[in-house]
């Protein structure tokens, strides 16, 4: 990727407009998961170290454009940053479109960009106002790189300099390493509830990976495609022909045993059985021990591992063993030299639950952007940075 990088630029005295991803869950004014803020702090520290005048902004929630509501304010993020080890004061500015004073040794958080009229439609006039605030635009929000909005795309067209922040640069490098030039054997694990939302991903990965592993509702379709009864399990029957086509082009191991329950609840009893024994009133909520161990064996022999989605309903204690075995196998393979990359909300939750965050080579912060990159789609925010780097 030929883009300018913030880390390579002279930032002394320069006004920086950093578009970060600070879209964190907030409940009653309190942040319930700080992962995205923690990921952004090194970028802010680097900007301060390099003597920049730092402005940072993000979207948060889904506000109505032109309407300010406290529920969508970045104030909780400001409070978090002030309590962190940044070592400089952090202040929130709500009205900034006509200019904002920013000094070295402080951070100015510009209020939620989605409150500004024209943000989502990439209005050129709004983009020019953003660009006028800065000397350098830093795109560091990979999670929104697939959206051409004012704060992710438009500003990059008009800012004097447009570059990638450390997070975005690392993300593109890690994804490139896993997908463009993977060490082989390359393994892709795709789980989750709906196969229709991940069909293009499966299709793209089937052309790159030496082996595909499917889990969750996606695996149920492959089980059904082999002629087994999946009972009341979540699956999309109309996609069975597609599953058969994929299975004919790539080796996809189908579970031989599963854990079933008769209700979708935390207290449901888990029964382990062969896939051929699932009854009409049962639902598959996890893979069985034999299947999990077989998959763990495959994982441990891989040199590149791409992981998106759990293999069972790991949120329920009775149905998390499969995902736990898979998670630990990925951690072990990584410890033995494999390059592993993981992404997607459920995957990150599983990584946290099983305490393996420091045992995965790279954890992607982008959900939709992560999958669109895998599908081979052009990410608008990256495309404009490349264009500006070469103009």
From Swiss-Prot:
EC number: 2.7.2.3
Keywords of the record: ATP-binding, Cytoplasm, Glycolysis, Kinase, Nucleotide-binding, Transferase
Binding of ATP, residues: 198, 315, 344-347
Keyword Nucleotide-binding on entry: yes
Residues bound to substrate: 21-23, 36, 59-62, 114, 147
MF terms (GO), sorted A to Z: ADP binding; ATP binding; phosphoglycerate kinase activity
Name of the top EC class for this enzyme: transferase
GO cellular component: cytosol
Principal location listed in the UniProt entry: cytoplasm
Protein's pathway: Carbohydrate degradation; glycolysis; pyruvate from D-glyceraldehyde 3-phosphate: step 2/5
Reactions catalysed according to its record: (2R)-3-phosphoglycerate + ATP = (2R)-3-phospho-glyceroyl phosphate + ADP
Complex formation: Monomer.
Protein name: Phosphoglycerate kinase
């Amino acid at each position: 990727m030929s883009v300018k990088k913030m880390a390579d630029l002279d930032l002394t005295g320069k006004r920086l407009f950093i578009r970060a991803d600070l879209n964190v869950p907030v409940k009653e004014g309190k942040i319930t998961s700080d992962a995205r803020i923690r990921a952004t702090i090194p970028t802010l520290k680097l900007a301060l170290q390099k003597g920049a005048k730092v402005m940072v902004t993000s979207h948060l929630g889904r506000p109505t454009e032109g309407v300010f509501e406290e529920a969508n304010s970045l104030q909780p993020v400001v409070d978090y940053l002030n309590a962190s080890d940044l070592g400089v004061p952090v202040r929130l500015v709500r009205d900034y479109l006509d200019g904002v004073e920013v000094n070295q040794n402080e951070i100015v958080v510009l209020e939620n960009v989605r409150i500004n009229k024209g943000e989502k439609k990439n209005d050129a006039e709004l983009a020019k106002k953003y660009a006028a605030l800065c000397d350098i635009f830093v795109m560091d929000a990979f999670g929104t790189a697939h959206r051409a909005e004012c704060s992710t795309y438009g500003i990059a067209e008009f800012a004097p300099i447009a570059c990638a922040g450390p997070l975005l640069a690392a993300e593109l490098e890690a994804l490139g390493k896993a997908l463009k030039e993977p060490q082989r054997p390359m393994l892709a694990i795709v789980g989750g509830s709906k196969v229709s939302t991940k069909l293009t991903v499966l299709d793209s990965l089937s052309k790159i990976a030496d082996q595909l592993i499917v889990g969750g509702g996606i695996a149920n379709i492959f089980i059904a495609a082999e002629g087994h009864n999946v009972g009341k399990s979540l699956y999309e029957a109309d996609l069975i022909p597609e599953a058969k086509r994929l299975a004919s082009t790539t080796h996809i191991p189908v579970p031989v045993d599963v854990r079933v329950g008769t209700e979708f609840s935390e207290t449901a009893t888990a029964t382990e059985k062969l896939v051929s024994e699932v009854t009409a009133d049962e639902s598959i909520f996890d893979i069985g021990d034999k299947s999990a161990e077989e998959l763990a064996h495959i994982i441990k022999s891989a040199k590149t591992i791409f992981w998106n989605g759990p293999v069972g309903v790991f949120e329920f204690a009775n149905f998390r063993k499969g995902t736990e075995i898979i998670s630990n196998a990925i951690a072990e393979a990584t410890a033995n030299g494999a390059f592993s990359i993981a992404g997607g909300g459920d995957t990150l939750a599983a990584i946290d639950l099983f305490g393996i965050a420091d045992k995965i080579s790279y954890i992607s912060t982008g959900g939709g952007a992560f999958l669109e990159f895998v599908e081979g789609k052009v990410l608008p925010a990256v495309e404009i940075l490349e264009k500006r780097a070469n103009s």
